[in-house]
């Protein structure tokens, strides 16, 4: 009986991850820079202030997920840029693993790999396509990518920064998906 309950819990958790990914994905796809965004409550207003990038501002949020979706999409794009889409793919993958009852052998290593992958994706977005952004002024990699590129270009120049970020991304993917190159 306990195994059946545990299996049901895993499947429901998988469905919840996939539903959350669909919500975030729909919010990102229907992101509109003209959506009116409220100011966050203190103390969150010290780390995030929504920027109205266009005039005139819409009367109501046009995001498919409403005001919550508009705020979520803006927050993710400002901090992670295109890394937010990586977050959606990750949530779908985690949900699928839960639905199939596939357990991960080393969740800490996978988390470290995901963080490396996210850092590499945000940094590469800021380095390679800096002005190709759906909305935030900071650029395609968000604040995370802009910070990485500023530090890496100062110490490694353009080519070195690209090599470091690419290596970070590839190593992170290998750690996250729990695979190795040498495995037959």
For each feature predicted by the language model, list its residue ranges.
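Alpha-helical transmembrane segments used as membrane anchors
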Residues: 1-184
């Amino acid at each position: 009986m306990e195994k059946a309950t545990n299996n049901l819990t895993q499947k429901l958790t998988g469905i919840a991850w996939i539903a959350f990914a669909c919500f975030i994905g729909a919010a990102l796809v229907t992101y509109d820079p003209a959506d009116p965004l409220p100011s966050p409550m203190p103390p969150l207003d010290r780390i995030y202030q929504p920027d109205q990038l266009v005039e005139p501002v819409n009367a109501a949020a046009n995001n498919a997920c409403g005001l919550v979706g508009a705020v979520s999409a803006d927050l993710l794009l400002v901090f992670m840029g295109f890394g937010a889409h990586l977050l959606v793919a990750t949530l779908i993958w985690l949900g699928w693993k839960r639905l199939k009852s596939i357990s991960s052998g080393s969740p800490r290593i996978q988390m470290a790999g995901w963080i490396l992958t996210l850092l590499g994706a945000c940094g590469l977005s800021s380095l390679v396509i800096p002005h190709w952004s759906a909305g935030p002024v900071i650029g395609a990699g968000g604040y995370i990518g802009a910070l990485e590129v500023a530090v890496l270009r100062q110490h490694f120049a353009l080519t070195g920064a690209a090599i470091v970020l690419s290596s970070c991304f590839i190593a992170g993917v290998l750690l996250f998906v729990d695979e190795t190159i040498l495995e037959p």
